[in-house]
């Protein structure tokens, strides 16, 4: 992803992104993947982990009805992600969670409890402030306080941004 590439360019050691849409060994909806990542965390192989949970699985912009299997897959992905976040935090690994600023994900009780318990910093920014043609307000919540320097609000003239529209569908089953 872009964040991984940016970290690599400034000389930080990075791992290949673990992605829901990747090969099965990198699919967070699989218990074996989660167990492996937990073992790496406990072994001290990570200093920081970023979680960008697909917002299309739980989007307020989508009006399509989800099947029971799709809902179960979404819940499994969220449960596994929260388990990994808690594992990282309990082993001294900095954590960053990224999602659109208006996402209802930020209102999930388990995430709110984690954020309070570990004193996360909230960082809001507009993508246009980092060279994107669209505004797209984003939010990071992080235990890495230095990331607060990324906070930016849009200062562009009105109507200059590309309009993001349409409906993106992402398979949530892994």
Which functions belong to the PLM regions below?
Residues 1-174:
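Conserved active-site and SAM-binding loop architecture
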